[in-house]
Regions:
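Canonical tetratricopeptide repeat
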Residues: 18, 22, 63, 104, ...
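Amphipathic alpha-helical repeat scaffolds of TPR domains
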Residues: 10-30, 55-73, 100
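TPR alpha-solenoid repeat register
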Residues: 15-16, 60, 101-102, 118, ...
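Structural marker of alpha-solenoid helical repeat scaffolds
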Residues: 9, 53, 94-95, 128-129, ...
Length: 182
């Protein structure tokens, strides 16, 4: 909280961006819906203030879109998911190889049940960076939701290789069983 207030008072793009990114990363790991919403709104405000200082900064636009998708979008607010997707689409229309934007668009596609588009975007990210665990995991989930068991299992197996942790592998094996039994 104090970091965000200090950044607003200082009003430098660097400090606003630092605070926004820190809050965004914390928000992505937050389980409490109330805290997640507060962090999303706080980070979004900081990204908006930074964008006022540097309106062409694509990373700031991706950060702002991410706040909407990972924040209220992740807990079921479709309007916020779409708001984030619109923000991110502006970025990929200028640069289709912006993998940060493609990743969050892919995640937004899964959240909003737009699986074919999500799969397309997430495949683009993993072809660019095959070790991107977040993209691989969401891609597996997207294929599972689409009913494509073979690809879901393939990407779940890939995630096990990337993490190489027995507890994680056990959890993924359970998920694979669920996919195969549906």
């Amino acid at each position: 909280y104090y970091l965000s207030e200090a950044a607003k008072l200082d009003n430098s793009e660097k400090k606003l961006t630092f605070a926004a990114r820190l809050i965004l990363e914390n928000m992505k790991r937050e389980d409490n819906p109330g805290k997640k919403v507060w962090e999303a709104q706080t980070a979004a405000t900081l990204f908006e203030k930074a964008l006022e200082l540097d309106p062409e900064n694509e990373d700031l636009k991706v950060g702002l879109g991410s706040c909407y998708v990972y924040g209220e979008g992740m807990i079921g607010n479709a309007e916020q998911t779409m708001k984030g997707i619109q923000q991110l689409l502006q970025v990929v229309q200028k640069d289709s190889n912006n993998m940060k934007a493609q990743l969050v668009l892919g995640i937004g596609g899964v959240i909003s049940n737009q699986y074919p588009k999500a799969i397309e975007r997430l495949n683009k990210v993993v072809s660019f960076d095959p070790h991107n665990l977040e993209a691989v995991s969401w891609l597996a989930d997207a294929y599972a939701a689409e009913g494509d068991k073979q690809n879901a299992v393939k990407w779940y197996e890939q995630s096990k290789h990337l993490v190489n942790n027995p507890d994680f592998s056990k959890e993924i094996d359970e998920r694979i069983k669920e996919v195969q039994n549906h």
